[in-house]
Every structure is written in structure tokens, then in C-alpha cells.
Amino acid sequence: MKKSILGMGIAVAALAASLYGLTGCQSHEGDDNQLEADVDSFATYYFNWHFPKTLKYCTRSSEPWLRYAASNVHKADVERLRAKEEDATVEINDITFGNDGVTATASITVRNFLQMDSIGQEAHLVDEAEFLLPMSMEDNAWKIRMVNLPRSGKRSRD
């Protein structure tokens, strides 16, 4: 009797584990690995000012913001970028999914980057700052959804 109860318990546990694996524990759409890789790629390109390369990681509605950022790069900014010894680096801190399952916010830390200032002002070198990147599903993939240029509350070191 004990063997059949134990066997039944193991069978139920195995069935539950199988169903859990098949249904997954995701409460959101899309692929987590794709999301993280694309957040990293977008942020690395964006904060190193490779704006055309960021387009594939953004929603279509984000393109005007990227064009705006690119149009505000001045000669002095380019010289400062070239003078930097190291590229900007990115660390993903957290990704929070919206209740709708098709929106998310990525919290990132960016180090050693030039941050654009107001129009007509040179960019400022920043040691470290945190940013929140809104995301949404577009064409069955996670994309950065820019509603403005990424901004942080941290001050520059210049």
C-alpha cells in the first residue's frame, strides 16, 4: 500500500512538473533572452552614439527621436567621442513587465558615456547613471519604445 501511495505521489509530482514546463511561468509575451540581448545592444549603440545601429532595436515610432539625437551631434561632440579611451558600458539591472504582458521597462546602468546637453551645448562626460527604457512588443519582438531621449538625474563629472 505504501509503495502505491508513494508511486502515485511521484506520478502526480512528475505530471505537475511536466505541465508547469509546458505552460511556462511567463506572464508576458516574447522571448526573455531576445529582450535582454536587444536592451544591451540598443543601449550600447545609443550611449556610444551609433544612432543608425539602434534602429533595429526600436519601435517604428522611436525613429524620430533617434533622428533628433543624431541631428544634435556637433563637431565638438565628435572630437570628445574620439578622445575617449573607452566606450560606454551597459549593465541591465532589472526588467519589469507590465500587467498587459506586452509592455516592459528595463532599468540599466550606463558607465563612461557622453550625455547630450541642451541644444548648442557640448555633451558632458558622465561616470555612471541609471536609465529606464520603456519597451513594447512590435512584430512579435521586444523593442525599445522611445517617447523622448533617455535622461538620467545624475550630474556630469565635467
Show the residue positions of the predicted features.
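Structured segments of extracytoplasmic/periplasmic soluble domains
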Residues: 41-49, 57-61, 138
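Sec-dependent bacterial lipoprotein signal peptides
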Residues: 1-23
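Exposed beta-sheet edge and beta->alpha loop/turn motif
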Residues: 97-158
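Intrinsically disordered, low-complexity segments enriched in polar/charged residues with Gly/Pro
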Residues: 6-7, 32, 81-84, 119-123
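Short solvent-exposed beta->alpha transition segments
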Residues: 36, 51-105, 111-112
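Short, low-complexity N-terminal intrinsically disordered segments enriched in polar/charged residues
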Residues: 20-48
